[in-house]
Structure formats: structure tokens, C-alpha cells
Amino acid sequence: METKAKKKWKTPHTFVILVVIILIAAAATYIVPAGEFTRFKDAATGKTLVEAGSYHRIASSPLNPLKIPSAIYTGIVKSASTITFMLIIGGAFQVITSTGALTALCKKLSKTFSKHKYVVIPVFLTLFSIFGFTMGMSSEVMIFVPIGITLALFLGLDKVTGTAMIALGAAVGFTAGLLNPFNVGVAQDIAELQLFSGMAYRVFILVVLLAATSAYIICYARKVAAHPEKSVIYGIPEDQEYTFDNATDTITVRQIAVLIVMALGFGILIYGLSKKGWYFEEMSGLFIFMGVICGFISGYGPSRIAREFGEGAKGIIVGCLIIGIARTVEVILSDANILDTIVYGIVNIVNVMPDSIKAVGMFLCQSLINCVIVSGTGQAAVTMPLMVPVSDLVGISRQTSVLAFQLGDGFSNSVLPMSSSLMGYLAVSKIPYSKWLKFMMPLFLIWTALGCLFMLGALIIGY
């Protein structure tokens, strides 16, 4: 009698993982008591802040299990701006990619770096960290992911490496937050500190994080280059847009014109983000314009441009749905009025910790809070009015409490399925979340350990 072979464990689809998290959140509405903080609008900044010591219980309003599908719909609707932006990015980049200009450029670059291919990793990380620590760019840099992937594949690396050197560069820069108005700027304002003060220590943190992240990605890339089967995405069929069997060594005049349009477009994008306060609406308009112009330059008719755009948008629809479904967790916790209770409970953990480890505890608790309040600005508005009094009582500087917030908010965004920026990167790159997590978890643990050391260092130097 033949024995049946054991079925190999397969990681569930990202939809399944998110639905499990949603069910846990729904169950929590029956267990966690409802409560809320009193909020007020700060006249000086116009921001809605939490009043310290104002938490109070209110009547429970647990979620009816039959309304979970409706909550998913609400999560998708509330993510509409992000989803629309991603669909437009997917469509526009498909038009641009189909011209062959991007492939030709990356092939030229790969030849330039062929003898020093691993140098590309720290160079890209550093470049995109600048976008992160100056303009607070995170989800916005997903537009550069196809370039990183194409270059990485030409260098004999994998899509994960190409995605990581773009996404993690922005993540490191955003977290270090030298001049980031969305985490450090908001938190320091609430903590009544001089804007962007404490710069020197944040520069040190940036350098250490860039070095650690570069070393980790290079080690992974070397392993994949030597043994392709060790790639975390080995065995997954390659996407058609990242196959280069017909790539040539020459760049046509039309392709050069497309690259010029792209360069001008990215220049306008950076100007708009830094000087005009652009967001998804303006960026979407720019990329529609770029895609159409590049299509016409390449000799495409309107119908060909439309077909390519549709194919590109279709290719990332699953990733777009993931972003909306992930938003459902926040919708459930907020509607049931248990979000503030969870934050209140986590902050109280810091209060009962020994003074010697309170700084590290503040960082770890901010990381936990980021699981339910993924928005950096939103997290600052809720937690900083609570953490500042705690730090004042135990003799920890307000600058250190801001540091705890920025590290706690920044690191976990690269692993949480609720992070719209992470899901955006993965949607564009078509890397399954489970595979990314396998690659990212060791680095996340390294970041967390470094975060604890940064907090201890802040205490030692009197930051």
C-alpha cells in the first residue's frame, strides 16, 4: 500500500492573511472595552491633537460579524486615492516600458556597473534615502521600482534586490527623518521643540542604517548571484515585462526621446513635491501625461496606448485590493471605538516599566502602536501628547521621545501588511507579501536591535 506524500506547507495568499487579521480585529471589538481620548484643534498648527489624561470609557459598539464584508468595502473606499494612483502608475509605466527605452537604459547601466555591480545597491539606497529624509517620500517612490528591478535583473540579481534598493532606501531616509516634515517635523512641533533640532544624532542614525541595510542587501544579492535557487522568489514564474530576450545594445532616437521625457517628468515631480505640495492627484496627472506623450513619441496610436495602459493597470489590481483590504483593520478598530483603548493600554505599559528601560520601552511601544495607526502624522497626533508627559516625569528628554516615535513609526512600515507604501511596492513589483516577509524579517530584527541601541545612546549622550 502506497503512503500518500505529505502535502508541502504553502504560505496562504495575502488576501487570506489579511482576512485572518480582520477577523482578529473584529473579535477584539467584543473583548477590548470601548473608550476614547478628548481631542482638540491646536490653534497654532491647525492639527487635531489628543488631550493627555483625557481617556475615558464609552459604550461598547462591537462589530456585527455580518458587517465584515461591508467593512472591507469601506476600507477599499477609504484607500481610493492610493489605489487610483497605483492604477495610473501601473498603466503609465506599462506604456513607457513597452517602448523599450527603460530596458535599453538599464542594459547600458548594467554594462557600466558590470565589474562593480554591488556598488549599485548603496548608491541607490543613499539616493532614495534623500527623498525620504527631505520630502518624506515613501509610497511615492514606488514609481521608481520598475527601474530598480530592470537594472537588478540585468546585473544578474533578482526582483527583490531591485525593489529593496529603492523601497528600503526611502524607508531608511524617512525613518532617520533629518528634515522629514511628516514624522520628525510634526512630532517636534507637538513636543514644543525647535523644528528639526537634534540633527547631528539623526545624521549618525542615517549613516548606521544605510550601512547595515547595504550590507544586508549585498549579502543577499551575492547569495542569489551565486545560487539563484536561494532567491526568496525562486520558482515563481517571471513576469513578461521583466523578460529581455529581445533586448539590444542600441538605443534608438525614439527611445532617447522617451528617456528625455521621463527625465523631465521626474524633474517636474521632484519640484512639485518639494515646492508645491503635490500629492496623488497632481502626480497622477503628470504620469498620465508622461505615458501618453511617450506612447506617441514611440509611434503608438491612441488605441495602442489605451491597450498598454489597460494591461499595466490590470497587472496590479490585486495589489490595489490588498491595500484596501488592509485598511479594513483600522476601519473596524475605529468604528468600534477600541483604537484609543489599545493606544492607551500600550502607553500604560511604558508607565509601569523601570525607568532604566523606559526609553527603549517607548520605542517598542511606538512600534506596536504603528500596527493599528500606520499613518506617521496620525500616530504623532495621538501618541506624542501622551508620551511627552511620560518622558518629562522620568527625566527623559522630549527629543528622545520624538526619536522613539520616529523609529517606531518607521521600521515596521517595511513589514506590516497594513502599510500602503509597502503594499504599493509589492503591487508594482508583483512580489508576494509572504516572500517579501521572508527576505525582510531578518533585516527588520536588525533594525529593531539598532533602534534599541539608538535609544540607549540618546540617554547616554543626553540627546
Give the label of every model feature segment.
Residues 1-17, 40-47, 199-308, 428, ...:
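Long, contiguous bundles of hydrophobic transmembrane helices that form the permeation core
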Residues 6-22, 153-165, 255-258, 310-319, ...:
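Alpha-helical transmembrane segments and their helix-start/interface "positive-inside/aromatic belt" motifs
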Residues 14-23, 48-103, 278-341:
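Core transmembrane alpha-helical segments of multi-pass membrane transporters/permeases
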Residues 15-31, 86-94, 127-131, 173, ...:
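Hydrophobic core segments of alpha-helical transmembrane domains in multi-pass membrane transport
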Residues 77-83, 110-123, 155-161, 256, ...:
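Membrane-interfacial loop-to-helix junctions in multi-pass transporters
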Residues 87, 116-147, 323-328, 333, ...:
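Hydrophobic alpha-helical transmembrane segments of multi-pass integral membrane proteins
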Residues 91-92, 129-145, 153-202, 213-218, ...:
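Alpha-helical transmembrane segments and, especially, the helix-loop junctions at the ends
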Residues 107, 116-123, 157-165, 196-200, ...:
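Membrane-interface alpha-helices at helix entry/exit sites of multi-pass transporters
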